[in-house]
């Protein structure tokens, strides 16, 4: 009996730790809102070759070497496909006293794959009347059946690529028929973080489907450039006037073509 089980046990020893090593928390960041709510935001990387679900982030907070508070949160999408990322926003509303440091770990289960057919087809930053920032865009269902409970999650980054906030929304209505497209708006509610945001990435999923693979790296560079220009122009509108003046000047255009 032992001889029959030993190959299985050896396989178990080498495969399960490997799966856990390929799923990890990355790029986490802690901040406190104006109302005192503590946030820890970050990404969950799945570098394994299997989809995972029931992904949970567990946090332990310490003071003077003693654990003083435990809490947990779930990944904001129901599944993370191989070579894809998840996002989490762990919040602590109550006062937990002075904290020296915290630790995070992640737990998950191997899942059945979902079709990757929910696609973000367009997106852009917008600025509201009271200087609040939002992301608006369109999401498409490239599947063969209706997608229900469609949601879009935004991971927001600073200039150095660090995660600084997470936000999400459901489409309205929250279903999307096959080969149809819907509009979405993701508000960036925390103004303390809005000042440092220069880039974002988006994930979308439904109960039936998950997101198509992310944009290639080059698209991210374009997003950074676009947002930097957006911020510069909103802070210095005269740049627009000068730019339009140059474009309406034939001599200036010809000098740039030589």
Q: What residue spans do the PLM features occupy?
A:
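Short beta-strand and strand-turn-strand segments in soluble, beta-rich domains
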Residues: 22-24, 54, 64-74, 116-118, ...
């Amino acid at each position: 009996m032992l001889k029959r089980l030993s190959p299985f046990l050896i396989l178990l020893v080498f495969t399960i730790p490997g799966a856990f090593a390929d799923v990890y928390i990355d790029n986490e960041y802690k901040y406190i809102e104006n109302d005192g709510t503590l946030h820890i935001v970050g990404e969950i990387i799945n570098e394994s070759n299997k989809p995972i679900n029931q992904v949970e982030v567990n946090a332990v907070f310490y003071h003077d070497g003693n654990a003083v508070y435990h809490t947990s949160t779930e990944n904001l999408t129901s599944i993370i496909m191989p070579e894809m990322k998840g996002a989490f926003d762990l919040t602590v509303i109550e006062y937990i006293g002075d904290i020296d440091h915290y630790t995070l770990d992640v737990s998950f289960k191997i899942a059945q794959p979902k079709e990757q057919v929910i696609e973000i087809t367009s997106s852009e930053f917008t600025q509201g009347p009271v200087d609040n920032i939002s992301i608006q865009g369109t999401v498409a269902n490239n599947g063969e059946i209706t997608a229900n409970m469609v949601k879009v999650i935004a991971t927001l980054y600073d200039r150095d690529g660090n995660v600084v906030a997470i936000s999400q929304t459901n489409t309205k209505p929250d279903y999307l028929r096959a080969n149809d497209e819907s509009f979405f708006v993701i508000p960036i509610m925390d103004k303390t973080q809005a000042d440092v945001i220069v880039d974002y990435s988006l994930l979308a999923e439904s109960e039936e489907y998950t997101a198509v693979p992310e944009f290639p790296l080059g698209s991210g560079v374009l997003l950074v450039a676009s947002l930097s220009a957006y911020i510069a122009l909103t802070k210095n509108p005269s740049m627009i006037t000068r730019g339009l003046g140059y474009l309406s000047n034939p001599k200036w255009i010809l000098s740039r073509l030589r």
